[in-house]
């Protein structure tokens, strides 16, 4: 799927309808008494979190959003209809920021949350409201109030069961394509993944959401490579799957490099559950794989397993393993 994790939009709630200056039309009675109704309230704009959304891409081309205007009041004390509300749907994990893109307004963490981002304007008052003992034929009425309008930023922090991390070209996209319905771009060079890819793996009648995070390089927490804009997507994943190319000349250094970047961004990332996966075992002999696994597993707090995305049995085993981690 196309992915967009940050977008600026303009929202304008509906203006309130104007009050009516109407008078009853009665024979031989001047003005006939006021009967002007109030204006309707302007439509309000809501943000609502939806589980079936994974990206903000819909807002890339539609950046201006307006709710309906309240209808003007009319004679016979008729109040105008309220303007139509507007509900903007966003993925779970979306954060709402003010125009400075720094001040957090709201954070969607659960399905079905609603947040009023712009209130509709109040309807104006009809002239009936101003009738008194000293003024039985008031011509006064008020106009509807303008609806609130803002420029806001929407930022998405992916909420997935499993975040796949590793150096560029570790095989993350191939793994995601093998075990889920995702179709990430795959090639044998660094930074094939330029945006987080999302997929859902089904196993034993259960589903696991996985996020393929763009490859980390040294200095990523300072913006090197694809930078910290993607590290934020790891924060809300329940489990980290650390993918390492088993043919790498220095597995230990490769592992530490990624862990250092995670820790430099946030120490909390190092506290997450982690499973280490040595990938591309099909490139080595079976005995060599066993020896590497034995040596690399020493002094590791996390479980270490092997994987070949070309073998169906290997894919099934990793699905079952991931399910046990997130259940």
UniProtKB/Swiss-Prot annotation:
Enzyme Commission number(s) from the entry: 3.6.5.-
Transmembrane segments: none
One Gene Ontology CC term in the entry: cytoplasm
Binding positions (Mg(2+)): 173, 193
Compartments where found: Cytoplasm
Principal localisation: cytoplasm
Cofactor: Mg(2+)
Enzyme class: hydrolase
Ranges of residues in domain Obg: 1-159
Domain of life, per lineage: Bacteria
Domain OBG-type G: residue ranges: 160-327
Subunit structure: Monomer.
Family to which this protein belongs: Belongs to the TRAFAC class OBG-HflX-like GTPase superfamily. OBG GTPase family.
Role this protein plays: An essential GTPase which binds GTP, GDP and possibly (p)ppGpp with moderate affinity, with high nucleotide exchange rates and a fairly low GTP hydrolysis rate. Plays a role in control of the cell cycle, stress response, ribosome biogenesis and in those bacteria that undergo differentiation, in morphogenesis control.
Name of the featured protein: GTPase Obg
Taxonomic source organism: Pelagibacter ubique (strain HTCC1062)
Highest classification ranks of the organism: Bacteria, Pseudomonadati, Pseudomonadota, Alphaproteobacteria, Candidatus Pelagibacterales
